[in-house]
Amino acid sequence: MILQEGLPLLYQQFTALFGKNLLLSWRNKRATCLQIFSSFFFILLIFCIEEAMKASDASSSAYKNITDPTLLVSPPILPCEDKFFVKLPCYDFVWSGNNSRRVTDIVSAIMANNPGRPIPTNKVQSFKEPDEVDTWLLSHPLQVPGALHFVERNASVISYGVQTNSSSESKRGQTEDPTFKFLVPLQVAAEREIARSLLGDPNFGWGLGFKEFARPAIITETTSALSVMGPVFFLAFSMFGFVLQLGALVTEKELKLRQAMTMMGVYDSAYWLSWLTWEGILTLVSSLFLVLFGMIFRFDFFLKNSFVLVFLLFLLFQFNMIGLAFALSSIISKSSSATTVGFLVFLIGFITQFVSATGFPYSSSYAVSRRVMWSLFPPNTFSAGLKLLLDATSTPKSSGISWSNRAVCEGGQATCVISINIIYQWLLGTFLFWFVLAIYFDNIIPNASGVRKPIFYFLAPGYWTGKGGNKVEEGSIFSCVGSVPLVEHNTPNDKDVLEEETEVKQQAMDGIADPNIAVQIHGLAKTYPGTTKLGCCKCTKTSPFHAVKGLWMNIAKDQLFCLLGPNGAGKTTTISCLTGINPVTGGDALIYGDSIRSSVGISNIRKMIGVCPQFDILWDALSSEQHLHLFASIKGLPPASIKSTAEKLLADVKLTGAAKVRAGSYSGGMKRRLSVAVALIGDPKLVFLDEPTTGMDPITRRHVWDIIQESKKGRAIILTTHSMEEADILSDRIGIMAKGRLRCIGTSIRLKSRFGTGFVATVSFIENKNDNNIGVGASHEPLKKFFKEHLKVEPTEENKAFMTFVIPHDKENLLTGFFEELQNRESEFGISDIQLGLATLEEVFLNIARQAELESATAEGNMVTLELASGISLEIPVGARFVGIPDTENAENPSGVMVEVYWQQDGSGSMCISGHSSEMRVPQNVPVTRPPSPNALGHKSLRQGVRGIVIDL
């Protein structure tokens, strides 16, 4: 199949990624509608605020035509509780002059004759002198609206004074007028009762009325709600798209979705252009709706200014925010942080809006450098543009800014440093700045795995030409702690591994490019640097971790190479290095001649590989059919063949019935099948399958095995798995890693013959219905004796139906004659069938893993406790097989006794003790290393736990 390249591939990837963005937005309708139509709610809110301001003004008499003012007749003294912000307990009024009997009677009459409400005596305070009143007022603020001061001059003259707080207060939009509310009622009451007292007629009528002059309504140029609240609301509206865009980009990075596309060969240019185009369309639509809604609600800002000018301001500003979101997404690694950063950007923009409103720094009094730095933050330039357009429509007589006057300075100045035309130029320039910076950051800032390009990667000719993939580049490894220490290379202990390493080194030295070799690994090493943590009064530093320690290996075409190993062996790290996910610390690997340490090389490699990662990397909102169409387009399949290829792969992995179901609804096994199909799309030359059948049912697993077997032709496959059956059936060669090193390599039969315990003989018996009461041992004792006499072995498993024996390799020369005799005596022993085979691959795997654990435990001192049946506790290294018991030497056992320890892997993949044999004699002439012990330990002290003796047999 011929794949597309160059510009046709770029266009195909762009359209596929654009379609993906469109589909994801469609399936997240709520967020998309919010981004497009949120402007309506902001405009509506501004409109409601402005109408409320107009209604508040209309309720005031100052803004009404008064032709016949209302007459106010004898207003009463109000309760003190009616005063705004009064403190309790309060008093309706206080008075001075209580040394005069006549004055006291006048005040009593004021209280009794108050219109509509007599004033209780406990609501009035009396004093002798005005100074006493002042003193009381100072010590009791806001507890009384006013005071009356009386002086009896003579029998016909009584003078008085009114004292009130002339400060007006506002509450809930209403202003309190102390003159008409408190002063006038006190004055009217005092004059009325003084007149009655002087005339001696308590029924003397005293009526007083007053009204304001007739006048027209006051016409003022009130401040528009849009001019006050608009800049903040417009910024908040634009932040919806910014936060959603930033969150989407960071989520794709966090969930490794972009990494999956990168491994399949997506162009960075196609990725960024697809996002820019889609977000640009959303921005254009949302900006258009904002302006239209503003015109519908009849705001002068939108009606008087040129439609194009207003639309361009919002459009270019939101484009700037897209560029800023791109740049920030290269730095942020967690989607949870994206919302926080978005709020922080809004908060900073909110603050700088007020600074920009003062004219800073867009005036000739500020240096150009300040304007440049200030304008790099998009909300600042946006605020300046809003100010120009708002000022142009600030009064009813203002005509706004037309398109032809866009370059004219504010106020008709001959020269200025800012105009709406200059604002547009700034917005265009800063968008390009942020967009280019985003692409640069995306290449040089290390991702979660530490991969980056050199700082001046764009100066390398290969970056533009795509050539030079076999040249190793510096700068592809990043570490925040400086240089990473390399592990020392050790000569392999295994002869097959040494032979493989020697062959690869010789080919590299001779410059031989074997066309039958797909992958050639040259001393691959990966070390994770230690970390430093500052705690309370101490600094904790961890040592570097060597995940892969010098791997040399060839992987041939048309073969499946299976890489086995316990958890932490380095399998997934090796695959991550080969696919370019993780940078290598040392060594290199050539995949069809391209180096994984070259950015050009890894780009070429990704065009010819397929990857099924250890953990599924899928979009929950996309179906399996849509996944395959997307990755087929990224790979460069001809458009005409994409549909048929996807249908075939879905049929191969039995997902045809669920082709249109979203992946988020799939089970774990279905997701793994989809990941396998994605890895095989585009006819890759090299396929990485990292535990591909995890979570599958047995029937589906067998079916996927058939697919993998059929896929070997014309390509190399690298498989990792924890299923020994899967490795045994599928692999042409097997390599077992442990502790970062390759421990053995070869075919399954080769490994079984070298590292297995021997041959496994299974003898099945003829069913005998008459021996129900005969024990197993009694019925098969002759056969057990036959094996014991000839091969010196005991059964490892036995029951009525069969018996299993493990025969050591050193008995191989006896097997031909032994089994000929056994076949001749089948009827004597009641045998129905005899099977002979090698040890299982699982046994080989456990032996290799156990030996690696023993080496590590011996070097690092990792010990576990072995509890013997006798109650003795022994401290033994992890992985030790034969362990001698100290101080058990006697005449019968001159070398002491030992036990064989059985090991297995626990749920986490770590080695743990599963049991041990009975005590047996230590063979003579076997060198042993005794544990350090200052004193001879008796049997009693063994119960307290001592170090066992490792015996190498």
From Swiss-Prot:
Cellular compartments per GO CC: membrane
Domain of life: Eukaryota
Record domain ABC transporter: where: 519-764
Annotated TM spans: 33-53, 230-250, 277-297, 307-327, 341-361, 417-437
Localization per Swiss-Prot or TrEMBL: Membrane
SUPFAM superfamilies: P-loop containing nucleoside triphosphate hydrolases
Residues binding ATP: G565, P566, N567, G568, A569, G570, K571, T572
InterPro entries, per the entry: AAA+_ATPase, ABC2_TM, ABC_transporter-like_ATP-bd, ABC_transporter-like_CS, ABCA, ABCA2/9/11_C, P-loop_NTPase
Membrane topology classification: Multi-pass membrane protein
UniProt KW keywords: ATP-binding, Membrane, Nucleotide-binding, Transmembrane, Transmembrane helix, Transport
Any one GO MF annotation of this record: ATP binding
PANTHER family hit by this protein: ABC TRANSPORTER A FAMILY MEMBER 11-RELATED, ATP-BINDING CASSETTE TRANSPORTER SUBFAMILY A ABCA
Similarity section: Belongs to the ABC transporter superfamily. ABCA family. CPR flippase (TC 3.A.1.211) subfamily.
Protein name: ABC transporter A family member 11
Recorded name of the encoding gene: ABCA11
